[in-house]
Amino acid sequence: SNIIKKILIFHQDMFYYKFNFILPNTKWVGTKACKFKNFKNPQWLRNVKDRKYKFYRLDTLFSETKYQSIEVKKNGGWHFTNIKTAEDIKHKLHSYLHHNEFEKSSLDIEDIQDIISNQKTIYNLKADKRVYKIGEGEKLEKIEVSHLPNYIKNNELKYKKWIQE
């Protein structure tokens, strides 16, 4: 009820493979929220652009994806992706929307394990969408468990497989 803007976008730290492998200088902006009265459908919310537009941008008055009434939560939480084994990541990428790109890469489980061991992302999020981006991406950094959500900190033994020493 204290949400004033039409759309909320959460800037979240991005983590790969292990709970404490962070992708520095990159924020996940895929987590969005709105009041139920403004909600159209899930795809509409996914398509909303992650930036505020100036009041004089007339195209925002007619756009389904560009809005002036956006609030960005700068410290919006954590986004964990591919917290999986190399085998499970391969299965996920074969099932993924862009599986053709993954299949062209000819990465096998050992290659994926090497990418994880070398603390790199499996694809380059900043690559031009028209070019090949699967393979070794950006370098991940290990952070201390103290920076993670309380639930993970309080259950560190339970999740030790997913926390890099």
Regions found by a protein language model. Give the residues of each.
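Nucleotidyltransferase catalytic core that binds NTPs
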Residues: 1-2, 144
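C-terminal accessory extensions appended to soluble enzyme cores
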Residues: 65, 69-165
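Conserved catalytic core of nucleotide-sugar-dependent glycosyltransferases
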Residues: 2-107, 113
